[in-house]
Amino acid sequence: MCGIAGFVSLDGAPADASVLEAMTDMVRHRGPDDRHTLLLSLRGSAADVALGFQRLAILDRSTRARQPMLSPDGSVALLLNGEVYDAFDARAELERDGYRFRTSTDTEVVLALYERLGLERMLQRLDGMFALVIADTRRGVVHLIRDRIGIKPLYWVQCGRTVLFASEAKAFLAHPAFRAEIDPEQVDELLAFRYIAGEATLLRGVRQVGPGHRLTIAADGFAETRYWSIPDDTEKLRLSREDAVDRLDHLLCRSVRSHVRSDVNLGCQLSGGVDSSLVTLRARAQRADVDAFSIVFNEPRFSEERWIRTAAATAGVASHQFVFDEAGFMGALDAASWHMDQPIGHPNSLALWLLAERSRAHAPVLLAGEGADELFGGYGRFAAAISGTPSSAPHDPVDAFIRATAFHSETRLAKLRPAADLGPAIEKRRAIFQEGRSDHLSNCLRYEMRTHLVDLLLRQDKMTMAHAVESRVPFLEQHIVDLARALPAEHLVGAASPAGVPVTKVVVKALARRSFDEAFVHRRKSAFNLPLAQYFRSKAFVTMMEDRLLPGMRSRGLVDVEVVRRWWRRALSAHPTTEGFWVLVALELWAQQFVDGRRAAHLNSV
């Protein structure tokens, strides 16, 4: 895992090496083990491409493996952030064909595949989590490529005749042509849903390369192309429950086997939930040196410590538990906001930030259970979608499902922002939903993969890479994705249990029942919430609100500050609007850092 930064001059203007160094500085936390920059020319004259790389050395820690990595003739430079898990199968094939490798990295395998197969055939071969930059001077192009699911981030923005790109948008702050401004068209969606679906961001003009997309930059412009789509027309498998569980078990074991490959210590991010517990079990079966790392809370209602201990004991791993409290919350607020690159929609991101900070000394690589809920139907709203549970509003099923994930209705949002208009955001999300061409449940799951999951993966990347910890997600391996898309509904969600708990993620829980008891597997799902009301009452937070956040909100003019005050009072009593209030805090924190340039001295300075 690493940090990428760079830019391309579309008009051939020479690249400024000092600007590249400054941009690369902004992502140095992602890769403290090595740093390398490279200037090259797409047109054979002035150096018009700038490539910067901060390396976190996980495989082949030698200097031979440094990036940017050049092809044998020096005409192609490649940057890879992430891991390609099937690279070693491809390596064996290439070696049989006579290719001689200089390193043991997946980066060199990807470079060889590009040279041998070309871009399109190479992309069809890659299974992993990655952001790729390929500068091909023979063809006069630069390719920006993101993995199929969107596990690793890659941002870009055009500033005049220069295209900037980076693993984190904060790198753009170091380029003199970039001006950080809020895009007003994205604010309503952020406040309602806590994140912005699709490729747009809250920074005007800044976009993400979409999951399964590539952006090709040439002298005459650039174009984005989708090279992979979530499987949609898959014929549903006719499997018994046991056969479905067996198949998932086989694929998860195989995926974890490829995910534990590392030349440094590796651990598991264990929440105590079913998904991370299964990953921990399978990881321990592959490596004896795997430990588990978890966050627990002083407040018993929010802590999963009982289930964490059960999972760790069952897997036979050492359990490291870190307490997250009011001091941890206040201590992480500014730093986590800075590293997130966007307003922190999920307040539990702060706990993940602390987990990565504390676990770094033990394990620079962590396996997580992220993705299983979105693939296999782990949320109650999926059960509602298949059962036809009526919405509280008279909307069609698509509209009802989309709005069910919003934290603020249009009525509530209008109180905060009288001119608010959720229409464009709803229509954009509807268009994403309607890309699906299957049954309603399958389309709901596809929509979650294209929206909510991508946002969760950004959180996973940014909070762990803030401390140079590589997060890996075995449930999102390609064969598991294909299986999930091919399973019929009865293996995903079912009717509520006698206790009134929706039966979700059926096949995953059936697999878990082979190792854990009924109480562990079928307890009501925990959302890993924080005791926010308690933190909001703290003296330190009250001072921050009164002295810094409310004045900032008032001068920014995005929201009605008197409404914010009322919501704050409700949030102090753990009112259901607590997390709705949180996003207002997150927005102002982020805006002060990225737009106003008000950052603590210990954060990256430009």
Question: Could you say what each language-model-derived stretch is?
Answer:
Residues 48, 59-64, 77-79, 127-134, ...:
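Conserved adenosine/adenylate-binding substructure
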Residues 336-338, 380-387, 601-602:
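Short secondary-structure boundary/capping segments
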Residues 376-401:
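A mobile, often basic/glycine-rich helix-loop segment
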Residues 305-306, 333-334, 377-382, 535:
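Short aromatic-enriched loop/helix-cap "lid" or pocket-rim segments at secondary-structure transitions
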Residues 266-275, 299-300, 347-350, 375, ...:
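Glycine-rich loop motifs involved in handling phospho/adenylate chemistry
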Residues 1-4, 174, 204-211, 221, ...:
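Adenosyl-5′-phosphate
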Residues 34, 153, 276, 372, ...:
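Short hydrophobic/aromatic residue motifs in ordered secondary structure
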Residues 1-340, 352, 356, 513-514, ...:
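Cysteine-centered catalytic environments shared across enzyme families
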